[in-house]
Amino acid sequence: MSTPFVTTLSSSLYGLLKDRLEEKGFILTQPQYTIFQARSPSVMCTLYSSGKLVVQGKGSKEFIEFFLEPEILLTFTHNRVEADLRPRLGVDESGKGDFFGPLCIAGVYARDEETLKSLYKTKIQDSKLLNDAQILSLAKTIRSSCTYDVMILYPEKYNELYGKFHNLNILLAWAHATIIDKLAPRPSGEVFAISDQFASSESVLLNALKKKNTDISVIQKVRAEQDIVVAAASILAREAFITTMTNLEQRFSLKLPKGASAQVKSVGKSILNSRGKEVLSLVCKTHFKTFNEICDSASA
């Protein structure tokens, strides 16, 4: 029987952990002296009133490494698997959930063991776990050692494409497929690509790839950023988002907050009132419900 994993959880994370476990299909109960206990067929996760979190079960290793640490604890104390030195291509995006700014998609091709070993020696990890300064620094390292490509869809182009596709996942599939097609060797041989599974069905990306001139096989999985090549792509995509946001702010003399918070809505209203709907449309994603809420509030 494996030794249980024990850690202390900050009270600010109780709700997040509970919500994410429910999303993952865990059955929640509340035995005495606990805040909750969550069970799946292979994992039991118990959060005690003291804040002590205990994880056990045959699936606990994968649960900790691929969910608990990267998504909740934001640490990496669990042993890493052996470095994967298979040549491969990783692709990821940034800006998908941000009302203001572009959508940026990046691909990284690690063509040999030497390239992969150099990546493993760095502090490369999922860009969501890094600050802007770390991202900008690591991006230089990635560009110097890997083949890469970055697509930046400024809001004006993004809105045009969304009007064509009418679906964000189809737009993402087209963009990912375009990047993969540009970077994939021909013939692809044993090289494969890894992408985050952003749609409920893998067929969305596969159908987009069928329209391209590549025979490369693609692995789609949740939390693909756990792979170092996808993590490298996520860093280049985030770097592109950061620098493009700065360019937009300088071009329009505006301060554009990230995300989709109440502050974002407030800034959007200010831009609409002072600069008009046309300028607002040039710095934001107009299919977000936030856009209609801003416009409706101005006409009310």
Curated annotation (Swiss-Prot):
Molecular functions (GO terms): magnesium ion binding; RNA binding; RNA-DNA hybrid ribonuclease activity
Residues where a divalent metal cation binds: 92-93, 196
EC number: 3.1.26.4
Cofactor dependence: Mn(2+); Mg(2+)
Family stated for the protein in its record: Belongs to the RNase HII family. RnhC subfamily.
Function: Endonuclease that specifically degrades the RNA of RNA-DNA hybrids.
Identification of the protein by name: Ribonuclease HIII
Source organism per UniProt: Chlamydia felis (strain Fe/C-56)
Taxonomic path: Bacteria, Pseudomonadati, Chlamydiota, Chlamydiia, Chlamydiales
